[in-house]
Amino acid sequence: MNCHKRSNGKNRDSYGSSVAHKALTKEVVAQRLALPNGPEHMMHYASEAFPFAYELFSEGNSAACAFLCRCAKQEKYARQLNDIMGSEREALRNALLSSQPKLRKNAAVLMGQLKVPSDVKYLKQALSVEDTRFVRPSMLLSLGSIGGDEAKAALVSYTVQPALSEEERVHFEAETEAYKTAMRSFLTFEKHEFTALNRPCEIELRSPDKLSDPLARELAEHGFRVSAVHRSDVHVHTEDMMGLFACRCFTEALIEISANSNPDPKSMGIKAKSFLEKLLPACHTGKPPFGYRLEIRGEGNIDRLAIARRMIAVMDGETLLNCPNNYEVEIRVEIGGNGGAFMYAKLLTIKDERFSYRVSALPASMHPATAAAILKYAEFFLGGKDARVLDPCCGSGTFLIEREKLYPCAGLTGVDISNKAIDIARSNAEAAGSIAKFVHNDCMRFTAERPYDELVANLPFGNRVGSHRSNEKLYAGILENLPKWLRRGGVAILYTMEYTLLKKLIREHPGLRLVTEVRTEAGGLMPAIFVIKIGQ
């Protein structure tokens, strides 16, 4: 097995470490958003920054609108934005008619992300009076994204004005491409079903940071030969694509197109086109074309739009069509710090039903793959089958459900102070066919009728508690209760953002033995996993 840390520059930047412990305020969020790539970097703190960003957006802050556009790609934030704005959508309409071209552009993008049919009339009105060419493509694309008869009629009646000068030619080409892409949204593609890979491919499985070893172990247990292990991904060379989804410790599976190659857009487009024209028809039912979406990631000064245009110009044809509002394949380009490009295909035709039990979630809910990977990391310290397990801060129930997926349990109990959390946890447990039971209570008041074998907890932090001082009180109370909740020799697995605090408190409890720990990285934060045994 080839185990090493990748040095291609794909690791996250150091932005997060400089503000990880600085409380966010409206002023801090405004300052950070104004920095180069500010909206992208603030996604590390999305849940904390979101309310401040919306307030700034309502005041006409273009960077805040760009940040909300990124948030709206996630369903929970899109739903939250639509709830906040209601049917009047005054803030969005005002932004669309602002005197700032960038704000108008970002507002149009946000409308496209939110996909509310009633916004079409505002986009039509704004497009009819828009005199800044670089803004129009976003309005056209959003009409295509929202869809419907009214949007289609608006696009059919629209004419891209010719370039009046050489300087306008770039904007003319961008507007023309946006118009074509928007119109493609109304094409009826034949829906394809994934059958199987027709040949072995290099598959990169993304794991939570520093939890790639548990994933590699899980893959080996399912008969896969691991070819490489990096800090946050594992590689396998296989044609059994569907078999990979028996494993739970990864967030996504990417088929590698090329690795550390020339980042020239034309060269990348040719490679992606050649690779996918052979792969897609061979492993799907139905005939081409396949709609795709191009995602370009990377640090530093990267002109994503220019790269995308040049790649699309090469790739589009009988087999592939750029259709970001109606796609079955995501073509992902990740440009590393050393300049090398990594290209992947993510097939949305593959139905990943591993976590389909998660019918609802809370804003701070842990990703199920993270819960699965943490449990796999601590597997050798767990009680195995027939253990009784407690989660005193259960939230949506993910940790308990994933514990039961690892090994059958004799009992699972979740406690949470939030009625909403308990309702969500019960719904998820029912969908999972879990035996878990949930209790609405303050965990500090919860008493165990008889000691449990294991405890798992994603400890609250930040706005979920209120302050560092509140964390200190809560964490001290939980550690004080561990010997009451767990039998002697029992195990507690704690996941927390408060590494220093929790480690200090553990030292102050001689009846608790720290067995192992690991610090990871998640969205710019530095969570830690602690495995504790009760009794020396």
Tell me the role of every PLM-derived stretch.
Residues 287-373:
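Nucleic-acid modification enzymes, centered on SAM-dependent nucleic-acid methyltransferases
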Residues 2-221, 336-536:
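Class I S-adenosyl-L-methionine-dependent methyltransferase catalytic core
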Residues 160-163, 186-324:
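Non-catalytic nucleic-acid substrate-recognition regions in nucleic-acid-modifying enzymes
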